[in-house]
């Protein structure tokens, strides 16, 4: 997809090479965290030959929120995991069900069994004990921020002290990730 428009999109072609449809066109107006202005497909889970549905994960204007989608043969796309955070899926071979994994900056992974419409059938692992243990440390919560330079916007996250006072002075620990997918 990158060759067509510069972004990682999906396109469905017939066997003659004719473009049939753009898959999962999620473009929407609104504020874009970190300057990401387009949908970026991050993973393709598969194609259901019986229904013509394509299942995939994508970032839609916000690189901190990955969601799982299904694009139908008629071109309509539905979000199967609408909760903000990082969502992934492992689909059954018949695409009737999937195991959803969701987490965000302040919550460990939650694993759920869902149907192919995104309805949660049961929670498999909620990691409540880990969340409660972390809460017992009485720490502040993590939050994203955008750091802007004249040329770029970078996304970071910070943990402020529990009783943060905006006028106070605090020590800072800074770490920059420079590996694959980094913004450096």
Regions found by a protein language model. Name each.
Residues 1, 54-57, 98-101:
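Residue position within the beta-strands of beta-propeller blades
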Residues 2, 14-50, 58-61, 71-88, ...:
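Multi-bladed beta-propeller domains
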Residues 2-4, 59-61, 103, 163-165:
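Short polar/acidic secondary-structure junctions
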Residues 6-11, 63-69, 106-113:
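Structural motif
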Residues 70-71, 166:
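Short beta-strand segments and strand-loop junctions that repeat across beta-rich extracellular domains
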Residues 79, 88-184:
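Serine-hydrolase catalytic core recognition
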């Amino acid at each position: 997809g990158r060759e067509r428009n510069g972004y990682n999109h999906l396109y469905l072609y017939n066997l003659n090479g004719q473009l049939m449809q753009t898959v999962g066109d999620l473009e929407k107006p609104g504020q874009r965290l970190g300057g990401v202005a387009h949908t970026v497909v991050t993973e393709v889970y598969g194609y259901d030959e019986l229904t013509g549905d394509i299942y995939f994960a994508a970032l839609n204007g916000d690189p901190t929120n990955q969601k799982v989608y299904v694009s139908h043969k008629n071109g309509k796309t539905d979000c199967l995991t609408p909760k903000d955070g990082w969502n992934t899926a492992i689909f059954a071979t018949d695409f009737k069900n999937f195991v959803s994994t969701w987490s965000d900056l302040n919550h460990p992974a939650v694993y759920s069994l869902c149907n192919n419409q995104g309805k949660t059938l049961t929670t498999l692992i909620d990691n409540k004990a880990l969340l409660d243990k972390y809460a017992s440390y009485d720490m502040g919560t993590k939050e994203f921020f955008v750091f802007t330079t004249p040329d770029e916007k970078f996304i970071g996250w910070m943990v402020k002290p529990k009783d943060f006072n905006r006028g106070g002075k605090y020590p800072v620990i800074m770490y920059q990730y420079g590996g694959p997918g980094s913004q450096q």
